[in-house]
Swiss-Prot record:
Entry-linked Gene3D superfamilies: Queuine tRNA-ribosyltransferase-like
Residues at which Zn(2+) binds: 304, 306, 309, 335
Binding site for substrate: 92-96, 146, 189, 216
Role played: Catalyzes the base-exchange of a guanine (G) residue with the queuine precursor 7-aminomethyl-7-deazaguanine (PreQ1) at position 34 (anticodon wobble position) in tRNAs with GU(N) anticodons (tRNA-Asp, -Asn, -His and -Tyr). Catalysis occurs through a double-displacement mechanism. The nucleophile active site attacks the C1' of nucleotide 34 to detach the guanine base from the RNA, forming a covalent enzyme-RNA intermediate. The proton acceptor active site deprotonates the incoming PreQ1, allowing a nucleophilic attack on the C1' of the ribose to form the product.
Enzyme class, first EC level, given as a word: transferase
Family: Belongs to the queuine tRNA-ribosyltransferase family.
SUPFAM superfamilies according to UniProt: tRNA-guanine transglycosylase
Keywords of the record: Glycosyltransferase, Metal-binding, Queuosine biosynthesis, Transferase, tRNA processing, Zinc
GO cellular component: cytoplasm
Name listed for the protein in its UniProt record: Queuine tRNA-ribosyltransferase
A single MF term (Gene Ontology): metal ion binding
Length: 361
């Protein structure tokens, strides 16, 4: 089994491209991770996701602990076997979903107590329990338990939240079972305050995580403020470890973040947009519901090799989406995931050539 490692092969200014080696194979960076919240990427077969070029998927601790439960998944051979995916899987810690989805959520030093959004059952999620669940799932990359600081937050509010995340990171690290080829990432917080981001990074770097995530962005602060934070935050992190920007997925944001030193991304945008009839293309977004596509016999993109573009016209996709056929969601999602993986491939090629990004989609 391979050791977990990050090898930077090319660098252009702050942008890096390389390979992350894991127990479940290699992943190319910069990488985009399709979101498989409940053990599936919506409207896609796992093998179809792999065909788009994805090297890694994201799963969600909160949803999987509720249904079908981590204990059931481990009895069935682990998440990889359960969902028929043999490449790396990253699982988030569940904290964000607990705080955003559950009813009567209460945050204490111990963790977060909450009621299930499904049936109202009461749970307690702590750093130790979150780490245990991710271990049971067999996650290739485990995320430390954190509090995602809401925006806007005053300096003092952000400081209190960041310090709690640091204490939880210590407990997450102590609970993590180290195995060859597996990793745990710490999550730096601090909202839009440079002083807090620097302190958070300093504290977490001392815990020697295998990689680091920048959390608490894309929560309403806007692109300008997000990029301002990314102008300095990655510089506080080790050069030789992966950097993951959580929940960011607009193409222009990915390109801007890569140019600021980010290596990994996840977002529901390509899948959710596909199910809602929106396609991403090199020429901008296409709302396939628009009546102007009803008689359009051309593909979404002429040079895209996904099944939607190879075999079907915009008129057919328009028809499927307008009448609510499942195939419409499948084809639109397949196209969008292909687009995002092609975008990452293009980004990696530009870094290898030492070229500035001259595209924004």
């Amino acid at each position: 089994m391979s050791k977990f490692s990050f090898n930077i092969h090319h660098q252009h200014k702050k942008a890096r491209s390389g390979i992350i080696v894991t127990a479940h194979g290699e992943m190319r960076t910069p990488a985009f991770m399709p979101v498989g919240t409940r053990g599936t990427v919506k409207a896609m077969l796992p093998e179809s996701v792999a065909e788009t070029g994805a090297d890694i998927l994201l799963g969600n601790t909160y949803h999987l602990m509720l249904q079908p439960t981590a204990e059931r998944i481990v009895q069935l051979g682990g998440l990889h076997k359960f969902m028929n995916w043999d490449k790396p899987i990253l699982t988030d810690s569940g904290g964000f979903q607990v705080m955003s989805l559950s009813k009567l959520c209460k945050i204490t030093e111990e963790g977060v107590s909450f009621s299930s959004h499904i049936n109202g059952d009461k749970y307690m999620l702590t750093p130790e329990r979150s780490t245990e669940i991710q271990y049971l799932l067999g996650s290739t990359i485990t995320m430390a338990f954190d509090e995602c600081t809401p925006y806007p937050a005053t300096f003092e509010e952000a400081k209190t939240s960041m310090q709690l995340t640091t204490r939880w990171a210590n407990r997450s690290r102590n609970a993590f079972v180290k195995r060859e080829g597996y990793a745990q990432f710490g999550i730096i917080q601090g909202s839009v305050y440079e002083e807090l981001r620097e302190q958070s990074a300093k504290d977490l770097v001392e815990l020697d995580f295998e990689g680091y995530a920048i959390g608490g962005l894309a929560v309403g602060e806007g692109q300008e403020l997000m990029f301002k934070v990314l102008d300095y935050a990655p510089e506080f992190l080790p050069q030789n470890k992966p950097r993951y920007l959580m929940g960011v997925g607009k193409p222009v944001d990915i390109i801007g973040a890569v140019s600021r030193g980010i290596d990994m991304f996840d977002c529901v945008i390509p899948t959710r947009s596909g199910r809602n009839g929106q396609a991403f293309t090199k020429y901008g977004t296409v709302n396939i519901r628009n009546s102007k596509y009803a008689d359009d016999n051309k593909p979404l993109e002429h040079d895209c090799l996904c099944p939607a573009c190879r075999n079907y016209s915009k008129a057919y996709l328009h028809h499927l989406v307008r009448i609510g056929e499942i195939l419409g969601s499948m084809l639109m999602t397949w196209h969008n995931l292909t687009y995002f993986q092609n975008l990452m491939s293009r980004i990696r090629a530009y870094i290898k050539l030492g070229k500035d990004f001259d595209f924004d989609s």
